[in-house]
């Protein structure tokens, strides 16, 4: 415990809780995280991956297809053929990244800017994805991060719209982000902006799709951020800190105010999976945010279901994000994963889309969070759907991501809304009831 420091109790004064500890920023664990379930069930995990493939816990392939496009279908087929156990994931993505980088370089030599652009984007996404499953702070992780940034920078130089790297101040350091302006944006024009917080297995470079991105097509600027504990931030020694996300929201607003392109009356946020929790923390004390929409919820207090009942990889990964290698220490730290201190402070309009049968967060936890919100709210529950919001209800009812974008657009235009709970049946029929 010599490398830990105790938090002040004041931010959580409203909630009775044990004394909490956080990792010291900049101090890396000497080993990878170790958990009892992961170590004892590794044989079962590997057999499940062999039987079900790389999507055993979440739809990793579908997310990459949505970001990179159908051109990577053969890559994904090769990935499925290669990945037969957990240890296969990192080298499989590294190999795909090297292949795509070579294709990009060859396309540039042949004066083919579009294939070069597409392959640099895809190679960067593969290098970033190779960081998932690598929970050791070492040269391999740093190399993957460096390659991701190198190749995404090359993509930026060929992209069809303005993109820039961003650093958001954070406690004397900074957390990374990527800023996009929609194609054909004219200097002097004011834009709405969405601040995107990915899930714990997501990253900022993938947050805006290579082609046909829904936010850019709707004329939004996008700031995709990796706050404390997210993807690149742990490489910098910046770990999970709920209050740190609250502080990050204020710094994001300061950064946006300094941008001449941004209409500060039209600022929204989105969150996916664990990003649903951290996006809520981010906006809770910053009035600049007028709306927030999240999918795939993570509101179970202390992450009980995701850490204790789901794939043991989730807990191991979150320990890495928290800068903690010892499971007993993490058991104390996880008590900070609690929305009760900030949910009531949220006055922005809030949309929550969750699955009735979410395996990572019980519906009751999501409903409790919704009840605690301090502003206008809408809850959408997809019948029989799991965490990834798929199946008949998502296919036949309002498509979650499209509805999210249109809902935010209506909120930023000032359209009125009702506090409602929508239950989306498998047929697509929507049953609406009022909520307090």
What are these regions (language model features)?
Residues 93, 146-185:
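N-terminal cap/lid segment of alpha/beta-hydrolase-fold proteins
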Residues 189, 193-259:
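Cap/lid segment of the alpha/beta-hydrolase catalytic domain
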Residues 281-329, 348:
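Hydrolase active-site cap/lid region
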Residues 373-388:
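Catalytic histidine neighborhood in serine/cysteine hydrolases
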Residues 346, 352-354:
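Short beta-strand/loop motif that positions the catalytic acidic residue
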């Amino acid at each position: 415990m010599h490398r830990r420091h105790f938090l002040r109790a004041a931010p959580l004064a409203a909630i009775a809780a044990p004394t909490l500890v956080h990792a010291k920023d900049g101090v890396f664990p000497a080993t990878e995280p170790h958990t009892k379930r992961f170590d004892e069930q590794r044989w079962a995990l590997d057999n499940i991956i062999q039987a079900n493939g790389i999507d055993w816990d979440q739809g990793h392939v579908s997310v990459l297809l949505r970001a990179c496009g159908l051109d990577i279908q053969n890559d994904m087929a090769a990935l499925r053929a290669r990945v037969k156990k957990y240890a296969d994931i990192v080298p499989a993505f590294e190999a795909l990244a090297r292949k795509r980088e070579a294709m990009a370089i060859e396309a540039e030599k042949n004066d083919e800017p579009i294939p070069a652009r597409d392959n640099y984007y895809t190679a960067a996404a593969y290098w970033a994805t190779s960081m998932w499953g690598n929970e050791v702070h070492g040269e391999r992780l740093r190399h993957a991060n460096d390659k991701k940034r190198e190749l995404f920078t090359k993509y930026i130089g060929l992209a069809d719209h303005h993109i820039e790297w961003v650093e958001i101040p954070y406690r004397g350091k900074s957390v990374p982000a990527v800023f996009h302006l929609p194609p054909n944006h004219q200097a002097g024009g004011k834009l709405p902006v969405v601040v995107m917080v990915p899930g714990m297995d997501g990253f900022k470079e993938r947050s805006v799709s290579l082609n046909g991105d829904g936010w850019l097509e709707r004329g939004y600027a996008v700031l995709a951020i990796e706050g404390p504990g997210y993807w690149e931030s742990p490489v910098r020694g910046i770990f999970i800190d709920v209050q740190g996300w609250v502080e990050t929201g204020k710094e994001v607003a300061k950064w946006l105010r300094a941008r001449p392109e941004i209409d500060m009356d039209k600022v929204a946020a989105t969150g996916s999976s664990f990003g649903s929790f951290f996006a809520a923390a981010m906006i809770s004390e910053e009035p600049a945010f007028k709306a927030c929409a999240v999918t795939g919820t993570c509101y179970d207090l202390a992450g009980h279901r995701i850490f204790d009942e789901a794939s043991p990889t989730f807990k191991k990964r979150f320990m890495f994000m928290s800068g903690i290698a010892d499971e007993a220490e993490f058991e104390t730290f996880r008590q900070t994963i609690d929305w009760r201190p900030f949910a009531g402070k949220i006055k922005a309009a809030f949309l929550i889309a969750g699955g009735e049968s979410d395996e990572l967060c019980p519906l009751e936890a999501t409903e409790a969070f919704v009840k605690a919100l301090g502003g206008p709210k809408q809850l959408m529950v997809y019948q029989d759907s799991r965490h990834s919001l798929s199946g008949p209800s998502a296919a036949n009812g309002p498509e979650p991501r499209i509805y999210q974008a249109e809902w935010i657009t209506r909120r930023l235009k000032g359209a009125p809304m009702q506090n409602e709970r929508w239950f989306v049946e498998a047929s697509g029929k929507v049953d609406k009831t009022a909520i307090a």
